Amino acid sequence: MQERIKACFTESIQTQIAAAEALPDAISRAAMTLVQSLLNGNKILCCGNGTSAANAQHFAASMINRFETERPSLPAIALNTDNVVLTAIANDRLHDEVYAKQVRALGHAGDVLLAISTRGNSRDIVKAVEAAVTRDMTIVALTGYDGGELAGLLGPQDVEIRIPSHRSARIQEMHMLTVNCLCDLIDNTLFPHQDV
């Protein structure tokens, strides 16, 4: 058991090192995309399933409340938090539309959709991205594995942050770290003189 525990930590560290080498440009582009949208008076919509939903909620909460320092609230909405809306849509046998309907209702040109999917193949996330494209929104996608169907939907203005791993647990860990990096970069760019 001790060796398995050490192996989990070692694999996580190795994934972090690989991501630190591969992802700074994509994370920087994503952060600047989010910052520019906020500066233009737009908002960020976030979605994911399971652990990815938790990461989406963490991002939205960090924008609305704060990340590490006090600052004005920033507009972000986690689309997975309204159980009445989610179950109403799903009850009509539209499980794949639970996020897309919200994107079509709430999203506007200039807004950003932060779409989080470990494999990039979740139908409801894919449909949300398709809806965001019709609303002239920009997409920041956090993925893993080969990026899945989600990667193929992204245009040149969009940003994919693909974790270099084929293990769901490692990808989800890195998605949380990436969300924290994005929050830090947004705060540091918009409020550079705030102390941690």
UniProtKB/Swiss-Prot annotation:
Q: Which GO terms describe its molecular function?
A: carbohydrate derivative binding
Keyword Plastid included in the entry's annotation: no
Q: What's one GO BP annotation on this UniProt entry?
A: carbohydrate derivative metabolic process
Every SIS domain range: 34-196
User: Keywords on this record?
Assistant: DNA replication
The superkingdom of the source organism is Bacteria
* InterPro entries assigned to the protein according to its UniProt record, in alphabetical order: DiaA (IPR023070), GmhA/DiaA (IPR035461), SIS_dom (IPR001347), SIS_dom_sf (IPR046348), SIS_GmhA/DiaA_subfam (IPR050099)
Mind telling me which Pfam families this protein's record contains?
SIS_2
What family classification does the UniProt entry report for this protein? Belongs to the SIS family. DiaA subfamily.
Tell me, in a sentence or two, what this protein's role is.
Answer: Required for the timely initiation of chromosomal replication via direct interactions with the DnaA initiator protein.
Q: Quaternary form?
A: Homotetramer; dimer of dimers.
The protein depicted here goes by the name: DnaA initiator-associating protein DiaA
Upper classification of the organism: Bacteria, Pseudomonadati, Pseudomonadota, Gammaproteobacteria, Enterobacterales
